[in-house]
């Protein structure tokens, strides 16, 4: 179990880990076959003088997060550069999960050994970054109390993992947009 609580453990460097770099059926439907965020990276064009785009990825290239060797290489690279943990984006839409495969495989395999936590990205998916912000692809609501319970139960496997980051013995879970919650969680 990874815990913090002493002065020596109080400061950690955590990198946000966006799981959008592998294809999923929903993105195939919404954006076209084989779509990942790499499509936008590769298509980026400079917007002003000196703007260097596309910004092609470094030594790992246009990686695919379905591959265990990619996730392990990312962890090695992160550790080499002083990253202590990954904070995986977690998507939950009233029981529907999206982009969960990389973290599910990390849990199942036990690799990489790098500590982790999650950030619940609790907002609807829209075409906002494509200039069509009013088109909702998948809605996000705070949900009923039954949905809260189902979500909490779904997180138990994550927070029970010995690599899961804790503060004062308690699992740390970030909420991307806490202001979007319709009622307080009652958590401490």
Q: At which residue positions do the language-model features occur?
A:
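Glycan-processing catalytic domains of CAZymes
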Residues: 2-188
